[in-house]
Structures are given as C-alpha cells and as structure tokens.
Amino acid sequence: AWSDQMNGAWRPISFFSENGKIELTLYSMEKEPEIHSDAPLTSELLRFRKETNDRFMFPLEKERERLEQEGKVETPEMKVLLEQFKKTKDRQELDAIRIKAHQLEKEGKAYTEEYKVFEQKSQEVYGKYREYQNEYIQSNPTLVGLYLLTRQARRMHDSDENMTTYTNLYRTVYVGKFADNPMTEYMEIWVASNEIKIGGKFVDFTAPDLQGVQYTLSEEIQGKVA
C-alpha cells in the first residue's frame, strides 16, 4: 500500500546455513527472488513456503494485481499524494506528504471500498494460513518448525491474542531441543519477557555491554520500579 512506497520495502530471502547447494536469482521489487537448494532444511522450508503460497497467498496476489491494474486500490485523494511523493525529493515536502497520507488513512479515506473488502478477505485468509502453519510447527519439531515459530514471534505485538499460542507451542514442543541454536535463545528470552508482571517473578540473566563489562539484571533493577 502507500506505506510501502513512502517508507521503502524489500523482499527478504530466508535459507539455512547448512551443507548443500543454494542458487539465488535476484530481481527488482516487482518480482520475487528465486531460490533453489538441495540442502535438506532449506529444501523443506522452500517446499512449505510453496505449498502455503499456492494455497493462501498467490490467489490474494492475483486479486490485488487486478485491483491495481484497474486503479481501484487508492482513492483519488491518495493517488494525488502518491504522485506528489514520486516527484519531490525535498525532505520537508516528503514528510508533509506522509502526514497527509496518514491522516487520510486514519479517516478511512486512503483506500477504495472495494479494496477495503479485499483487505478484510486478506485478514481472513491470513488467519487460515496462520492456523495451518501452527499445525506444521506443532507436528514438525525441526529447525524449520523452530524458524517458523521464531519468525511469527518476532511479528507479535504485546496486545496480540495469539501470543499465548506461540508461547505454548514453544513450551510444549521445542523446549530442550536445539539448545545451541540462536533461535532457541531468542525464543527463551521472548517467552520470559512476555511473562514479566509487576511484582512477579522474572528470569535473571547477565549480559555484557559494548565494552565487555558484565551486568546482571537483578542488580541493575534492585530498589527500582522495573
């Protein structure tokens, strides 16, 4: 949408560091990068991604492309701002355009009614995709499953009702597995941080700063409101 164009966007490429061959073909933003691999973990990740893209994502992409081709995504007011954004390089003018675009979005005047219906449908499809992915994560306690779980956890917000789902998935399926993997460390910290309550228990830990000096959490917050 407008935020992709005004704030910048990119197409990330995910693969595992493992023995095997990986071939990458990169394109501009208009086309998804191509990746092929005979390495087991990366191959399974690519297989799962293709399966879910074919089932959930590609039909949505085709529908969005149709709306874009027919000019039915942005309202006339938003189209004017997008044209202004493309033509100017002045930082103050760009900031002013972003503010106006945010205001249009806040007032529900940034997108057409047809596109709003599409957005609602997208949310429903993504919910089905997330359920399907959760089943895979639970049934396949591999590094691929842990990667998908970690990626989903990184996207969570504090108010997200699915946070408990991912916490339980980690606790019941992945605790004790892949102890030396950085994704395990991330999930341990993520789960612990989301369980911190005022007056409640917390996981104490020690970590260095940029100069290598060690600091312990319990010592740093002693006598303070944390």
Model-derived regions, located:
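N-terminal "domain-start" segment that seeds a small globular fold
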Residues: 185-221
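Alpha/beta-hydrolase fold active-site loops
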Residues: 224-226
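N-terminal targeting signals for export/organelle localization
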Residues: 24, 128-198
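Extracytoplasmic/periplasmic, Sec-exported soluble proteins
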Residues: 121-124, 162, 219
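A non-transmembrane, solvent-exposed segment enriched in polar/low-complexity residues
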Residues: 1-120
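Extended amphipathic alpha-helical segments
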Residues: 111, 118, 122-129, 133
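Intrinsically disordered, low-complexity segments enriched in polar/charged residues with Gly/Pro
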Residues: 64, 122-123, 191-195
